[in-house]
From Swiss-Prot:
Organism in which the protein naturally occurs: Galagoides demidoff
Name of the protein described by the UniProt record: Cytochrome b
Database matches in SUPFAM superfamilies: a domain/subunit of cytochrome bc1 complex (Ubiquinol-cytochrome c reductase) (SSF81648), Transmembrane di-heme cytochromes (SSF81342)
GO annotation terms (biological process): mitochondrial electron transport, ubiquinol to cytochrome c
UniProt binding sites for heme b b562: 83, 182
Amino acid sequence: MTNTRKQHPLAKIINHSFIDLPAPSNITAWWNFGSLLGLCLTVQIITGLFLAMHYTSDTTTAFSSVTHICRDVNYGWIIRYLHANGASMFFMCLFAHIGRGLYYGSFTFLETWNIGIALLLAVMATAFMGYVLPWGQMSFWGATAITNLLSAIPYMGPTLVEWIWGGFSVDKATLTRFFAFHFILPFIITAMVMIHLLFLHETGSNNPSGLPSDSDKIPFHPYYMIKDLLGLIILLLTLFSLVMFSPDLLGDPDNYTPANPLNTPPHIKPEWYFLFAYAILRSIPNKLGGVLALLSSILILALIPFMHTAKQRSMMFRPLSQCLYWMLVADLLILTWIGGQPVENPFIMIGQVASITYFFIILILMPLTNTLENKLLKW
């Protein structure tokens, strides 16, 4: 009797990707974040779809439509907060996923790594545009401040900003186009995720040792299916606890005030997951320099595979690199804290030191440490 799972053209693809996929036998819980990101994307698309059914992308009614969703729509409040906090969970998983890739040397899968960076940029763009939609104070001023950064581009900057705004300020045209892009981007992200997985399955997964695991593989199902299921339950429990007990913990109180172009909030700041990049942007007094530093802080990830001079792939057996890695994590936490502080001393100085440290660790200390470790191991 033929097995449909292995014969049917569609079932065969699913079978090779999630059931009979040969996976390394020693991958840890750090490898769970890929499937958790898939779950987050699914939650965001489903909740977003239901929100879009009731939301209006007009400056006069956008804020009221969000209030209407929370007050009048059946379980509207839970859908809204699942979507808002789902974005936070998405970024927590994203940062953990990228961190694992850095630690265990997964960036040597160049195609997978590069499409991953493209995915990160797409998710960041989607989250930024989504934050503008409720049309609160922080939505409006965040949109104004961040889109205004493009005016730093020489010659064509100011024209480009007005083109994005669809006028001479952030207004109805801006809100409408942001809603359109925010709606379509998750589907583009889904397509990119499929390409990401396609490239990953060309090489197979990495593992904590960084060594080839062809001699010791196990089927994805049932072993990693059950393992992913545990991660999934933990993530959903965390998300629902956040939504039920403190839904506004990660939000900004200013966004409960309708957008007012005549009144600037005392501190314009983005959501917590952008604060590290925002701190790097603010730490440079020059506008164009700040924009370049902001872009570099993300795009520097693309350089990492080319700066990897170590003979060992993973950091598992490289204590000096491990110390640097955790210094980088601490530095990013400091930058996140600084991004949420007002622009005054000592925060300005701390932000500048942390920004320099960030680039110094990645561009100089890490390659040097890799070479030193090779020497110590007489390689």
